[in-house]
Amino acid sequence: MGIHLVLFLFLASLRLALSQDVEHGLILVEGTQAIAETDDNFICATIDWWPHDKCDYNNCPWGNSSAANLDLSHPFLVKAIQALKPLRIRVGGSLQDQLLYEVGSLKSPCHPFQKMKGGLFGFSRGCLQMKRWDELNHFFNNTGAMVTFGLNALQGRHPSGHSVWRGDWDSSNAYDLINYTVSKGYKIDSWEFGNELSGKGIAASVSAVQYGKDLIKLKEVLNSLYNNSDLKPLLVAPGGFYYKDWYDKLLQVTGPGIVNALTHHVYNLGPGSDEHLDRKILDPEHLSKVEAIFRSLSETIQKYGHWSSAWVGEAGGAFNSGGRQISNTFVDSFWYLDQLGMASRYNTKVYCRQTLIGGNYGLLDTTTFVPNPDYYSALLWHQLMGKTVLAASSDVFSPSLRTYAHCSKGRDGITLLLINLSNETRFTLMVRDRVPVSSGGHENATKIHVENSFLSHLKRAFSWIGRKGSDVTFREEYHLNAKDNYLRSQTMLLNGVPLEFTNDGEIPTLDPLLISVHSPIHLAPLSIAFVVFPYFDAPACAAQTKL
């Protein structure tokens, strides 16, 4: 009886192993030249203005996460920002175009946002007290954050039907805020003009011609107020959804040197109420659709505004506060990291995640301030991925394997980001550069040859070993999985270990596995991996600035 049971269990386990697909492949990295470059500080997160009673789909997930009432003294918040130092924080969102500043000649009383029928987004105007502005700036200074602050771009305008707003922008209140900021010596890295007013807008829109004229006015304000300052903040705009004709016209109207960065928003997963968000996240075809926007914006900048650059100013995946029990769980990292990799390929300099805290899509839990899985994804990117982007491709047939390559951050070599969207296929991968070793033969350096023999891959895979750093026999691997293989888990595993605050309340160290460079990379189904090759021979990385 016992022998039969053992035999049954063996056969069952063998059947399970055989039922899991294994696909072998070769990843080629073009290390001779960069294809794109990000900013030194690519990772960014937002702090919004939504009050606690902002609700979507009978869910009110914002709590006290607004820039107006966030607990700036919470140790988890401070440590989370400092671990990403310098983290760019974009302060802004839907309500910023209804926000006044209690400074200078403002005559109206300074009240917080309140629910109001007929108001934009269902809220009244709000007001930022200078006491709170002081507190925010002291907080930013203490945590080492780089600040992008969104200004009210509707002040002075009037609605004229169909969500279109007309009239010149009234710069007086913004002037007083910026003047106060300069007088206090507060370091604002960039000022952003407006939120989601481009094209058709969301609740309101402004024509590209009018917007451009007002940006020229704002640039004059900045040049005047910062004339005697060592600080020279950037002007970024429009913080909206990308409409090609609108963005083209904006650059043509403003001309050279006005807009330092074009910001656009990404919510390519649709509404947070969608019951199939996780399916969209794991669908490679759906994830790839947004690539057309990155490509088109890059072309717009090359044609009309070479002095400018592309930023993702806000991206939460699913709009209306994100997907409940999706955007704050492990499965969202498939979307988030794929976005970071894809945006980088198109010279996106900055990528701002909606949000640092607040809504369902916060990097930190709104109530406990404990990091959600995407926080650790951002932290790994911040620690490992340099600003120089390399071309990476593979001969894997499955579209479920997503591959991105950068020069490593602050050291020699390269770092790969590998994403496996398949729930069935395990990938066994070799890595090599595209530059062939001279051996008397000829090899096409720009085309991947699909071969049936995995051993052939193995023989070719380490052509770079010996040309540089031949004494290094290990690579670093960081494998990310969901706890208990439950994709909606709020706990991420790094190499099998849960990522949680230490007993001392510190962010955990992100320790890699050291794997022989002579062995293949094994990427499990529904997993993500960062793989660092410390001495991969990539000439494009030689000149990379050490951070």
Predicted regions and their residues:
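Non-catalytic accessory regions flanking glycosidase/transglycosidase catalytic cores in CAZymes
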Residues: 2-261, 290-313, 317-547
